[in-house]
């Protein structure tokens, strides 16, 4: 708002005084001020809106002697404009006319009826269908952080108490809130800077006693012991602020928020922000959703199922009872997916419809969709009855039937209702006798008008006479200009057109009053009956929410059963001791995008074999092999089947990845600094139950520094921490580690080279790689031939300095990036290195195809 606007408002017109008083209550956000068929914005709001929405900036008269900048949007298109603003992180106060213009003296009474913010939206048009939309609050004191999240579109309310900065950063990455509330004295601003939807809140909103009082009031409880959050003061501070903000913005009760859950670190596998990013769980490194784990696993048929699956993927559980139950359910459902999925698809997004019901913002089509969901329940229950699985039967019971509510909605709502109740025509005929009577009066107009037109034509003999209606002038009798001089004396002129005259007669005027009254009465009664439907449905809200949750879970499990069958996944076995044994493991995403068969590989990690030093050429598949191990572990710990022939997996508490790096220029951190920060986090927090992926540690600095750091890190992980570690490196010295300490083994990925060409085998073999094939990879990448030629010359010089260079490495510190070309056929070389006795029939067949391609 302009600073020069008069603060006492007295110099402004009455309408602008009303606007300015309302705007003063919401200074930080845009105010949509309803005027007739438009929402208007004034002053700085108008200037901002015109830029954000690309709409015209005009002026509206003057107030206090100054022209008023103005922008406006039609009320019927408001959802589209709100969606644009919310996507840009803006919040909007919606101000409606609540008084009657006919009876108002001065400006019509108006008030703000709701505030739309990025984290508190529930409207279907504003939400991403298959993603959670979270409001979050963060609090910090000397003991750590408090963090709370609320999905207002489902009522899911969670809190946690991250102990340190890294854990807090991981939580922010996992939950990715649309809006984040923070205290005005929040110390760790660098943690949240740059995030969307940041909202600074006063300190008193985070007060612990107020928080307890707010939460008890919301849940109708005397204390919070039953929710297991009583001893989480930091989390409660965040939750209290969050709940108050939700109430302030919605301007109504929130009956669908009926509990709060504590999320504890020990309940799930912890993944830091870097790990979530590197594993590309729901978002790829470019920020998109293609070629992610979710893109392969998510063939759910309901939006609420899709959102639940993504929550599972970001919070793998450690409770093997839960996991075994999910595995059993997936196994039991495999023969039923084709029958269940088409019916589940018809259920739709019941979860979000129920939230809108609770907020009393559900539209007629929401109730029609709810009715359609209820109509699927009998068939779903009948199909599930034959499934021999206790967890499936438990879900079937939770689903309920709701025959009474289905019957109510079938009687009350027409088959295909309009978008808004204000347009009428929502309540079905036969539901309410009085409504039917008023409608009959209003609908009888057509017959009456046709009869009147025939009668008057016959009486007057005027063939151009017709009876009509428009919204401005009401009912009329129209006669062409050529015959208007013959109009009877009792015809009173109502409107003159270019080619016709319009008249009214007392009988038509009387009927008009009657029809318009009956239409108004019918519409008012219809709105009342619609509100009463909410009162009839809301007592069942808790059972309905349980049903939606059960249907979403069923969708996820049926989806995982279908994926397991279609993609040839196997059920993993959980074992008590740390370790991972994989037979013919595959990368779930890479195998889907390859145009050729994926080369499956084994893996064996155990207390006796805790670390694998992985060597081999760039592009040879080291990173794929490492990531597929982490993804198989993650999939196993959501209860899913996995891409392998056989998997045995022990307890895992954390998954760490130090894979690739880019400069974090915004924070002033180089590639090497980023790498070392992530490495420090691993060395401080990994345990013997952690799975650690380390790729090319130390390459961001000088050779000797890098090698020393890589050696020390590997030694620490293997000897002290004893974590299950995959350690990929180009430092050939590290392949000596197995000789110097127990529990370490070498594996390598092979390649065949001929001149400037190279064939990657992508198969993991025991032992260290003999060379790095850097020259061939460089040629493959399109490095100019003269550069490759000069590199060969330089390599010969280096070899002459170090006679054993070919057998060892340049300067004895780093695997050779360049290799002397050998004029041996790659097929011959392949055969020389081949041990035929070690091949399975399938591998032998694969080798024949490879050799054929090398000739």
From Swiss-Prot:
GO terms for biological process: mismatch repair. Belongs to the DNA mismatch repair MutS family. The gene is mutS. ATP binds at residues 616-623. Gene3D superfamilies: 1.10.1420.10, 6.10.140.430, DNA repair protein MutS, domain I, MutS, connector domain, P-loop containing nucleotide triphosphate hydrolases. The keyword Ribonucleoprotein does not apply. GO terms for cellular component: cytosol. The lineage of its organism: Bacteria, Pseudomonadati, Pseudomonadota, Gammaproteobacteria, Enterobacterales. GO terms for molecular function: ATP binding; ATP-dependent DNA damage sensor activity; damaged DNA binding; mismatched DNA binding. This protein is involved in the repair of mismatches in DNA. It is possible that it carries out the mismatch recognition step. This protein has a weak ATPase activity. SMART domains: MUTSac (SM00534), MUTSd (SM00533). InterPro entries: DNA_mismatch_repair_MutS, DNA_mismatch_repair_MutS-lik_N, DNA_mismatch_repair_MutS/MSH, DNA_mismatch_repair_MutS_C, DNA_mismatch_repair_MutS_clamp, DNA_mismatch_repair_MutS_core, DNA_mismatch_repair_MutS_N, DNA_mismatch_repair_MutS_sf. Transmembrane segments: none annotated. It comes from Escherichia coli O139:H28 (strain E24377A / ETEC). Keywords: ATP-binding, DNA damage, DNA repair, DNA-binding, Nucleotide-binding. This is DNA mismatch repair protein MutS. Pfam families: MutS_I (PF01624), MutS_II (PF05188), MutS_III (PF05192), MutS_IV (PF05190), MutS_V (PF00488). The keyword Chloroplast does not apply.
């Amino acid at each position: 708002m302009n600073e020069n606007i008069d603060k006492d408002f007295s110099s402004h017109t009455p309408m602008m005084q009303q606007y300015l008083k309302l705007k003063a209550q919401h200074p930080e956000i845009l105010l949509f001020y309803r005027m007739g068929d438009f929402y208007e914005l004034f002053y700085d709001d108008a200037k901002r809106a015109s830029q954000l929405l690309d709409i015209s900036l005009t002026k509206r008269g003057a107030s206090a002697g100054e022209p008023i900048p103005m922008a406006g949007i039609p009320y019927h298109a408001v959802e589209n404009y709100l969606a644009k603003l919310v996507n840009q992180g803006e919040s909007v106060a919606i101000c409606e006319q609540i008084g009657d213009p006919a009876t108002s003296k001065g400006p019509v009474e108006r008030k703000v009826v709701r505030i739309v913010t990025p984290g508190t939206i529930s409207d279907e048009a504003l939400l991403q269908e298959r993603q959670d939309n979270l409001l979050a609050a963060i609090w910090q004191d000397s003991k750590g952080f408090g963090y709370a999240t609320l999905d207002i579109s489902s009522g899911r309310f969670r809190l946690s108490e991250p102990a340190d900065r890294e854990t807090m950063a991981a939580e922010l990455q996992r939950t990715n809130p649309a809006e984040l509330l923070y205290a005005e004295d929040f110390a760790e601003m660098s943690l949240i800077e740059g995030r969307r939807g940041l909202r600074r809140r006063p300190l008193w909103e985070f007060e612990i006693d107020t928080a307890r009082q707010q939460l008890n009031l919301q849940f109708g409880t005397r204390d919070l012991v039953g929710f297991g959050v009583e001893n989480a003061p930091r989390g409660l501070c965040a939750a209290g602020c969050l709940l108050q903000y939700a109430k302030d913005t919605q301007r109504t009760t929130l009956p669908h928020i009926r509990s709060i859950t504590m999320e504890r670190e020990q309940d799930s596998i912890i993944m830091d922000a870097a790990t979530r990013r590197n594993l590309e769980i729901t978002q790829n490194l470019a920020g998109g959703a293609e070629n992610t784990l979710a893109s392969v696993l998510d063939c759910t048929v309901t939006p609420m199922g899709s959102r639940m699956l993504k929550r599972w993927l970001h919070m793998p559980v450690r409770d093997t009872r839960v996991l075994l139950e999910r595995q059993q359910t997936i196994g039991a459902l495999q023969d039923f997916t084709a029958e269940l999925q088409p019916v589940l698809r018809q259920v739709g997004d019941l979860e979000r419809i129920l939230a809108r019901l609770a907020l009393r913002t559900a539209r007629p089509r929401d109730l029609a969709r709810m009715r359609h969901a209820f109509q699927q329940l009998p068939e779903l229950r009948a199909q599930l009855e034959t499934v021999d699985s206790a967890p499936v039967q438990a879900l079937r019971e939770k689903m309920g039937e709701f025959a009474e509510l289905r019957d109510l909605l079938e009687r009350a709502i027409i088959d295909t209702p309009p978008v808004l109740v204000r347009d009428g025509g929502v309540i079905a005929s036969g539901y309410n006798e009085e409504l039917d009577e008023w409608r009959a009066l209003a609908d009888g107009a057509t017959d009456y008008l046709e009869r009147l037109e025939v009668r008057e034509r016959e009486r007057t003999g005027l063939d151009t006479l017709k009876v009509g209606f428009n919204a401005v002038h009401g009912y009329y009798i129209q006669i062409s200009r050529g015959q208007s001089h013959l109009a009877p004396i009792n015809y009173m002129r109502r409107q003159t057109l270019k080619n016709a005259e319009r008249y009214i007669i007392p009988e038509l005027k009387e009927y008009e009053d009657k029809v318009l009254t009956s239409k108004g009465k019918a519409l008012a009664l219809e709105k009342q009956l619609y509100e009463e439907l909410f009162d009839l449905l809301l007592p069942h809200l808790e059972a309905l929410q349980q049903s939606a949750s059960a249907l979403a879970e069923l969708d996820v499990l049926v989806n995982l059963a279908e994926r397991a069958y279609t993609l040839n996944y196997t059920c993993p076995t959980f074992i008590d001791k740390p370790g991972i044994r994989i037979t013919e493991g595959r990368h779930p995403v890479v195998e889907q995008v390859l145009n050729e068969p994926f080369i499956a590989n084994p893996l064996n990690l155990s207390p006796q074999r805790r670390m694998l030093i992985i060597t081999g050429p760039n592009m040879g598949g080291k990173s794929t092999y490492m990531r597929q191990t982490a993804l198989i572990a993650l999939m196993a710990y959501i209860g899913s089947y996995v891409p392998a022939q056989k998997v045995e997996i022990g307890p895992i508490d954390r998954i760490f990845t130090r894979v690739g790096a880019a400069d974090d220029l915004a924070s002033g951190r180089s590639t090497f600094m980023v790498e070392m920060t992530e490495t420090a986090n691993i060395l401080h927090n990994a345990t013997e139950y952690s799975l650690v992926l380390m790729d090319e540690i130390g390459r961001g600095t000088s050779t000797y520094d890098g090698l020393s750091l890589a050696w020390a890190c590997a030694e620490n992980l293997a000897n002290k921490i004893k974590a299950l570690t995959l350690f990929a490196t180009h430092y050939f010295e590290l392949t000596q580690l197995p000789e110097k300490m127990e529990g370490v083994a070498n594996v390598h990925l092979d390649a065949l080279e001929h001149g400037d060409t190279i064939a990657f085998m992508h198969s993991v073999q025991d032992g260290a790689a003999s060379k790095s094939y850097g020259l061939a990879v460089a040629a493959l990448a399109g490095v100019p031939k003269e550069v490759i030629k000069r590199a060969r010359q330089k390599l010969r010089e280096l070899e002459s300095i170090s006679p054993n260079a070919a057998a060892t490495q340049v300067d004895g510190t780093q695997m050779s990036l360049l290799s002397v070309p050998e004029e041996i056929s790659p097929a011959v070389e392949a055969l020389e290195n081949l041990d035929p006795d070690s091949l399975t029939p399938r591998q032998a067949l694969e080798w024949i195809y490879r050799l054929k391609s090398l000739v």
